[in-house]
A protein has these predicted regions:
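An acidic, glycine-rich "communication" segment
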Residues: 2, 11-20, 35, 108, ...
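Helical hinge/lid and interdomain linker segments adjacent to catalytic or ligand-binding clefts
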Residues: 7, 23-130
């Protein structure tokens, strides 16, 4: 049996914090990968993963269908559209393929795609993820809002399966862990009723 192979892009952040103390200030930097929570769980299921943290996506994310073909699925998580659109050469006024269109075409050709929600997914915080009205939105089963899509729920909420017997939920709990936020999207009319 062929091992499932995915390209997982995102779920990392470089953080700059400035401390202002009257007339004086200092800045310190840190780096974190929230991918450390999900990637081991996927690997436990026998999934082979090639991981690109956010800062590597601009230069290293595939530019051609041939580079995407080895993957059964591409996953983006907390990764805005600009990281996919702006290859470093584009910033030097050289053309490169539109990777949002490439991902759309990859899905049309039968490749899997999953966008995991986050502050830089779908529309995102202050609409900075900006996937509304892009080629990649055409491949999603939902419409991305044209404005900040966050629904913040500090009290927490638990999603429940509407149809726990649906095949896509095989092996998942009927009640999901508590979440504090989600990206609001609209199910495309041609997709029909959501099952989760």
């Amino acid at each position: 049996m062929k091992q499932t192979r995915i390209l997982f892009a995102g779920e990392s952040a470089a953080i700059a914090t400035t401390h202002i103390k009257g007339m004086d200030s200092f800045t310190h930097y840190s780096y974190g990968e929230a991918s450390r929570y999900i990637l081991p769980k996927l690997r436990e299921q026998g999934i082979e993963i090639d991981y690109l943290p956010c800062h590597d996506v601009m230069a290293k994310f595939p530019l051609t269908m041939e580079e995407l073909e080895p993957y059964d699925c591409v996953v983006t998580s907390d990764l805005g559209s600009n990281s996919l659109l702006f290859h470093p050469e584009v910033l030097r006024s050289h053309t490169k393929p539109n990777r949002l269109a490439l991902l759309r075409d990859y899905v049309k050709a039968g490749g899997g795609f999953l966008m995991i929600g986050g502050y830089m997914s779908f529309a995102g915080v202050e609409n900075k993820a900006r996937f509304h009205d892009t080629e990649l939105e055409e491949a999603l089963p939902v419409e991305v809002l044209a404005h900040d899509d966050r629904v913040e729920l500090p009290q927490g909420f638990c999603a429940r399966a509407v149809d726990p017997q649906h095949p896509i939920l095989n092996g998942l709990p009927e009640v999901f862990p508590t979440m504090l936020f989600y990206n609001k999207t609209l199910v495309k009319p041609e997709i029909g009723r959501a099952h989760v």
